[in-house]
């Protein structure tokens, strides 16, 4: 079953945080408090979409990706961003956070 397409309403330039070793990416459309996260089921990568209190898309995480460009990531996550120019997207390496051992 194909997930319903979500639309990004912000006009802010997105930032794509990439972890090519893990095949993961996070596309951040805006900074806001995440109210809830929904998973998108379908063929392809594992997709989780972060939403704010008004159900607007904050960002989307994809795991199991091989191509790291905005149009492909949006297509794989069933998200439209009509007000965003993919050419302006910033791509950065995801920061590695140290895992703290359990005490």
Where are these regions (language model features)?
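Small, basic N-terminal interaction modules of short regulatory proteins
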Residues: 1-103
């Amino acid at each position: 079953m194909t997930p319903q397409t979500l639309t990004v309403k912000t006009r802010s330039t997105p930032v794509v945080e990439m972890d090519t070793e893990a095949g993961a990416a996070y596309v951040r459309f805006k900074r806001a408090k995440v109210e809830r996260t929904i998973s998108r089921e379908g063929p392809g990568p594992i997709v989780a979409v972060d939403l704010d209190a008004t159900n607007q898309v904050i960002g989307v995480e994809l795991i199991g990706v091989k191509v790291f460009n905005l149009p492909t990531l949006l297509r794989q996550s069933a998200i439209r961003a009509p007000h965003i120019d993919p050419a302006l997207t910033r791509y950065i390496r995801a920061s590695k956070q140290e895992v703290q051992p359990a005490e």
